[in-house]
């Protein structure tokens, strides 16, 4: 058994929370293990002037950390799973999916108003095409404004800016103790989350069997089934672009239920569908369900939506 572990992480407050959480959990199970953090500045932390959709790189918040992992300068990387591309670099693997926090998105508004009660032509801040698409389908009058930076920076920009509301993931807001700022938690019926939202992905080298065995203690089986279904769906739909896709899977007693959404960036077209599979006994079966739903979405018109978006990539 290893005596030391180095965790690679971004340096944002939320990333540090995630890394410290991982460190604490591993220390609880392996009290004699010496665990340290290595902070890595990623491309996504540096390129803050452009919307994420315009940058186009799928590994903005992960690939720089993965370089350290491949070079054996760290033993594992802790990521927000929603930031992790569905294809990991050769030699790397997601070895643990941590128990998921609430997957829903939230609205933070200046007046405390809920989403549908915001004034006409309200300015809503988000950097996500997924949120933009679903917001515009609900309220075509909204003016969507790009907002970048870590969570603390976004709250500062929001408080100082001319926004009426801002949309964020509940998980990050809760973990950094901003829950008192929430105006509304949005149900999945109107806002499907990002693939993997609320879960952490712990990435290791494939050939590092000791570290893989250590981090297994953090793997949450239900989350693994759900996130593998969602990621398989995204992988089958994606073509290397930032695209408006939402998904949410639940898994209980061998039954997987998966909801998914693909929409145009302007919100004028949106396709939602779902699938239920019973008797599942392995995560690979959950992945098959994700691929099956992706194929159904493509048949229903998602291919046309995605091909239009890819033209501008």
From Swiss-Prot:
- Pathway named in the protein's UniProt entry: Porphyrin-containing compound metabolism; protoporphyrin-IX biosynthesis; coproporphyrinogen-III from 5-aminolevulinate: step 2/4; Porphyrin-containing compound metabolism; chlorophyll biosynthesis
Q: Which reaction does it catalyse?
A: 4 porphobilinogen + H2O = hydroxymethylbilane + 4 NH4(+)
Post-translational modification S-(dipyrrolylmethanemethyl)cysteine, affected residues: 241
Q: Which domain of life is it from?
A: Bacteria
The first-level EC class reads transferase
Presence of the UniProt keyword RNA-binding in the record: no
Q: Could you tell me which Pfam families the record lists for this protein?
A: Porphobil_deam, Porphobil_deamC
Q: Write down how the cofactor binds this protein.
A: Binds 1 dipyrromethane group covalently.
GO cellular component term, pick one: cytoplasm
Enumerate the cofactors the protein uses. dipyrromethane
* Gene Ontology terms describing biological process: chlorophyll biosynthetic process; protoporphyrinogen IX biosynthetic process
Query: EC number(s) per UniProt?
Result: 2.5.1.61
> What GO molecular function terms would the record report?
hydroxymethylbilane synthase activity
The alphabetical list of record keywords is: Chlorophyll biosynthesis, Porphyrin biosynthesis, Transferase
* Role: Tetrapolymerization of the monopyrrole PBG into the hydroxymethylbilane pre-uroporphyrinogen in several discrete steps.
The miscellaneous remark of the record is: The porphobilinogen subunits are added to the dipyrromethane group.
Q: What is the protein name for this chain?
A: Porphobilinogen deaminase
Please report the organism this UniProt entry assigns to the protein.
Chlorobium luteolum (strain DSM 273 / BCRC 81028 / 2530)
| Gene encoding the protein | hemC
